[in-house]
Amino acid sequence: MILICLCRQGFEKEVAAEITDCAAYAGIAGYVKTNADTGYVEFVLPDLDSATALFEAIRFDDLVFVRHWFVTPAIASDLPKEDRASPLMASAQALPPLAKLEPITLDTNDGKALVALTRGVTNHMRTVFKKAGAFNAKSDWVGQVLFFSGEQACIGYFPQSNGSLWVGGIPRLRAPKDAPSRATLKLEEAWHQFIPREQWDQRIAPSMRAVDLGAAPGGWTWQLVNKSMFVEAVDNGPMAENIMASGQVTHRMEDAFRFAPERAVHWLVSDIADKPARVAELITRWAENKWFKEAVFNLKLPMKKRYIELQLCSEIITLALDNAGIEYTLKFKQLYHDREEVTGHLVLF
């Protein structure tokens, strides 16, 4: 059995390190196979029981660099152009009952070129499955069809209760026309990732007070204003005029690393481009003073040792809060709209 882990192109090494560490901690044997810039990693498992144990032991939401995952019995090669579906149908005999079957693609130029082929083959297989009565709407397993090239593909499955919110791990969010930058989508995606949709009305509510550190030109502030919050935007740079015209934003032209709020707020957000450890220390200072209830922040990772750097930044925050006796939850995720960075979510209790 092979666990396929999809990721941002160029982050295969980080995924390999992360899934190896998580599997080892759970006592699950396996080894990685990876190629640079392919957008995926293979984690080879000894048998079906190991795959089942892995899904039970590792929570997908605890993984940072893995965008999406599923298990496949094997990767089929040398698929005939006249009938690519039959070899995949044969491989599907080893799968549990599926609730549905989805086409997914790698987030690379080669992967995008295979969208039409993947959809066509998947639609054909769906028709065959439906005629055979093979789908079970009550099943937790979702089938996946992925093409690596025109001649190589696989069919696999993952549990709906322990996987990505989005098909293939890619969200379908539209950039608002009046937002000052596309960075606004990072915060929107972060809310989807870290906060259950049914809790939005309580946790992302109108009239809440928020601080945006390093706010200019206002991509993240726009999201807060759009949720009818009152925002202190901290940045020496200029803010977009339409955001300031809302009447909900106070522009503090100060150094984000030195700013201290006059009173605690509900939301702290930050997309500062600085050394990740320095940003982690900034978030820690705010947390130790209990100046917020929830925070979303980005850490810009270095080109080398990104996985190690993230662990160090996480330790900066957790060690300080543990020593202070503060209850919290801290999670990280490399979002689809992130680049050489990861997004953190810290909740204080």
Swiss-Prot record:
The active site is at 300 (proton acceptor). It is an enzyme of class 2 (transferase). Signal peptide: none annotated. It comes from Saccharophagus degradans (strain 2-40 / ATCC 43961 / DSM 17024). InterPro entries: RlmM_FDX, RNA_MeTrfase_FtsJ_dom, rRNA_MeTrfase_M, SAM-dependent_MTases_sf. Disulfide bonds: none annotated. Its EC number is 2.1.1.186. Belongs to the class I-like SAM-binding methyltransferase superfamily. RNA methyltransferase RlmE family. RlmM subfamily. GO terms for cellular component: cytoplasm. GO terms for biological process: methylation; rRNA processing. Gene3D superfamilies: 3.30.2300.20, 3.30.70.2810, Vaccinia Virus protein VP39. It holds the Pfam family RlmM_FDX. Keywords: Cytoplasm, Methyltransferase, rRNA processing, S-adenosyl-L-methionine, Transferase. It is found in: Cytoplasm. Catalyzes the 2'-O-methylation at nucleotide C2498 in 23S rRNA. Coiled coil: none annotated. Monomer. S-adenosyl-L-methionine binds at residues 216-219, 235, 255, 271. GO terms for molecular function: S-adenosylmethionine-dependent methyltransferase activity. The keyword Transferase applies. It catalyses: cytidine(2498) in 23S rRNA + S-adenosyl-L-methionine = 2'-O-methylcytidine(2498) in 23S rRNA + S-adenosyl-L-homocysteine + H(+). This is Ribosomal RNA large subunit methyltransferase M.
